Amino acid sequence: MKTSVRVPVGAGLAALLLAAGAVGCAKEDKASESPEMTPAAAVAKAAKNTEEINSLHYRMTGKVPEEGRVKAEAEMQIKPTLAMSMKMTALDQGAEGTAEIRLVDKAMYIGGGPEAAKEMDGKSWIKFDLAAMGAGDELNQLGGASQADKNPATESTFLTGAKDVEKVGTETVEGVKTTHYKGTVTLADLEKSLADEDKATRDKRQKSLEQYEKMGVDKLTMDMWVDGDDQTKQFRMRGDAKKGPLDMTITFLGINEPVKVTAPPAGEVADLAEMMKESQQG
C-alpha cells in the first residue's frame, strides 16, 4: 500500500464547510411578535438560539478559495456527542472533487470513492484517529478537515458584531417566510469583541477566526434569513481571500432530528496511523 497519501480534493474543504455550515438554531418557544425589534436585536436573538443546538440537517452551496464551486449536504449531531456525515462535491475538480466525510467515535473517515481506491490498494476510505493524532503534522495535512471537532455554529454569532445590520425585506426560503438581514464585519472588530466574552466563548470564536485569517479574509459580508420562531433558516457569508472569493450559502433543512452515523466497513478503510507506522519501519 502506498504510504504517501493524497487526500481527495473535497476533503480539504471540510473545515470551511463545517465552520460556515451550521449556523442554525435550537428550537424554543415562539417569541411574541415584536415589530419594534431592531435589525441588530433580531439578529442577536437568532444568534442566541444557536446555544441549544442538538442536531441539524443542512445544505451548502457556493464558492471557496482555490477549489471553486462546491455543494454539500450534511447531518450533524452536536449533543450529547459529536457525530457527522457529509457528502460534498467540488464541481470544478472533476472526479477527484467528490468526497464523503464521517465523524464518529472521535475518528474522522474521508471517502474518495473509486479514485481514492486506485491509490490505496482498493480501500476507498482513510481513517484519522483525532484523539490519538491531536494537532500533529499528519492531521494538519487535512487542512480544514482538522477542524471538524469544533461546534460549527460559531460563525452565526459574527453578524452580531456588524455595525451596519439592516433589514433587507421579507423572503420565502424553502417554503418558510423569513426576514432577511444583512451587514458587514471585519475580523479586526471581531478580534476586539472577544475581550468581552468568557474564556470558552473566546476560545471557540478565536479558533474560527484563525481559519479566515489563514485564507487572507479581513472582512465578511453576511446575510441571515430568520423565520418566525427567531431561528436562522438560511445564512450566507462572502469575503475576498488571497486565493479567490469566498461565497457560501447554508440552508437548514431540519433541526433536532435523530442523526445516525456509522463507520465505514473495516475492509474498505486504510488507517493513517498504521500507514505512517509502516512507512517509518520501512
Swiss-Prot record:
GO cellular component: plasma membrane
Residue positions of covalent lipid attachment, annotated as S-diacylglycerol cysteine: C25
Location(s), subcellular: Cell membrane
Lipid anchor positions (N-palmitoyl cysteine): C25
Keyword Transferase included in the entry's annotation: no
Statement: the UniProt record of this protein carries the keyword Lipoprotein: yes
InterPro entries: LolA/LolB/LppX (IPR029046)
Membrane topology (UniProt): Lipid-anchor
Gene3D superfamilies assigned to the protein according to its UniProt record, in alphabetical order: 2.50.20.20
Chief subcellular location: membrane
Keywords linked to the UniProt accession: Cell membrane, Lipoprotein, Membrane, Palmitate, Signal
Signal peptide: 1-24
Protein name per UniProt: Putative lipoprotein SCO4651
Species name: Streptomyces coelicolor (strain ATCC BAA-471 / A3(2) / M145)
